[in-house]
């Protein structure tokens, strides 16, 4: 970053992150948020995949969804070219799961043109219970930061 680079203002970054987060609940990339040719570099546990385009991203969201879900933004950090967002997605229903993700999003003209996403995978009830016993957290997953 050079001395002439500026960080995206917090309000714009927060607004863009909230819109992006909504995709994980609606399972739709929406209009006016993601560029038609946006590049996605995704890192789920033990895998990596790349997608191009808002349509491909929307299809991927629908392919991995099973049951109603909610997504909550935990933190947004503006960058010179966009934002970093940490969020938690919770799936309700017969097999509830919780997943944490970290996204690095690049914006151009107000649209996401590139997104790199890291996911810890879906943690079901049994894994969360085992984790609580075997590796208690000093700072448990907070929903309010």
Predicted regions: what is each one?
Residues 1-145:
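C-terminal and inter-domain tail/linker signature
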């Amino acid at each position: 970053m050079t001395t002439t680079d500026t960080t995206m203002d917090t309000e714009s970054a927060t607004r863009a992150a909230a819109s992006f987060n909504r995709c994980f609940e609606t399972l739709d990339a929406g209009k006016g948020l993601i560029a038609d040719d946006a590049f996605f570099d995704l890192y789920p546990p033990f895998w990596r995949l790349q997608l191009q385009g808002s349509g491909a991203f929307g299809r991927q969201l629908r392919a991995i969804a099973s049951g109603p879900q909610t997504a909550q933004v935990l933190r947004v950090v503006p960058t010179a070219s966009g934002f970093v967002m940490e969020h938690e997605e919770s799936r309700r229903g017969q097999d509830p799961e919780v997943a944490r993700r970290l996204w690095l999003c690049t914006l151009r003209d107000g649209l996401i043109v590139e997104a790199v996403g890291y996911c810890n995978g879906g943690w079901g009830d049994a894994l969360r219970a085992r984790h609580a016993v075997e590796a208690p957290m000093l700072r448990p997953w907070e929903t309010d930061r």
